[in-house]
Regions:
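Conserved signal-transmission helix
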Residues: 1-36
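Conserved short strand/loop->alpha-helix "switch" segment adjacent to the catalytic nucleotide/phosphoryl-transfer site
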Residues: 28, 32-38, 117-144, 166
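Conserved DHp (HisKA) dimerization/phosphotransfer helix of two-component histidine kinases, i.e.
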Residues: 43-124
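Conserved ATP-binding N-box helix of the HATPase_c
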Residues: 50-57, 61, 131-160, 190
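Short beta-strand/loop element within the Bergerat-fold HATPase_c
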Residues: 156-171
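Glycine-rich acidic phosphate-binding loop
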Residues: 171-178, 215
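ATP phosphate-binding glycine-rich loop and adjacent ATP-lid/helix-beta elements
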Residues: 178-210
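C-terminal end segment of the histidine kinase catalytic
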Residues: 216-221
């Protein structure tokens, strides 16, 4: 009889554990769905703003004095939107981005900037895995720096990204003083929220723009 009671208790415990596991799995799926919903809402807001800005550029294209440069800048914006979507979906999948791949993204921006009339060269000193958030902030920083340099006609523009002790540093040296440059509130808030900063600094006896971020899952080199 005692054995039967023990077996009955064990059966109830196993059933309870199975229910707890099932409940935990349901909660996990709900949390994942909620997190993905929040991410997609964030992407939707972000893309809506970028597409709206892009639509304004396209609308004003016939009135511009240099339509070729304007068309090149629109292509630059489209490239940025495409790559940001790529980074977003990598983040949803919990994947990292190799520094070499980020280097390809940055080379694309530099090439399109040159078509827009801005002589640009960007060196990516990262080759190992990077956290998606850090990679996204570096990519957005490069895009906004190029956009500001185009408006200021600050050619040439030299940029280099490297890992230092405990931090990522992304420097840009433009052809004119960037002290009055203003980055978007979205970018500055995201950088600050990640424990980083964007600031003007003396670079090679000239004033440059520097983004610093704390190192996360990145590897040096």
């Amino acid at each position: 009889r005692l054995r039967q009671e023990i077996q009955a208790v064990q059966a109830r415990l196993e059933a309870a554990n199975a229910l707890l596991r099932e409940e935990g799995e349901v909660k996990r799926r709900l949390m994942t769905a909620e997190a993905n919903r929040a991410l997609f809402e964030q992407l939707d807001r972000d893309m809506e703003q970028r597409v709206s800005s892009l639509a304004g550029l396209i609308k004003s294209l016939p009135e511009t004095e240099q339509p070729r440069d304007a068309a090149a800048y629109i292509t630059l914006c489209l490239c940025h939107i495409k790559r940001r979507c790529n980074l977003f979906f990598l983040a949803c999948q919990g994947e990292a981005l190799l520094g070499d791949e980020l280097g390809i993204y940055l080379d694309e921006l530099a090439e399109l900037a040159r078509y827009s009339g801005l002589q640009t060269l960007i060196r990516c000193g990262q080759s190992g895995p990077m956290e998606i958030r850090s990679a996204s902030l570096c990519y957005d920083f490069a895009f906004e720096t190029i956009s500001l340099a185009l408006k200021a006609e600050a050619s040439p523009l030299m940029g280099w990204l490297e890992a230092e002790v405990g931090r990522l540093t992304f420097r840009f040296l433009p052809g004119s003083d960037p002290v009055e440059w203003r980055f978007s509130e979205e970018l500055t808030a995201a950088v600050t929220g990640s424990g980083g900063q964007i600031a003007c600094k003396d670079l090679d006896d000239a004033v440059g723009i520097c983004l610093t971020l704390p190192l996360g899952g990145e590897t040096r080199g």
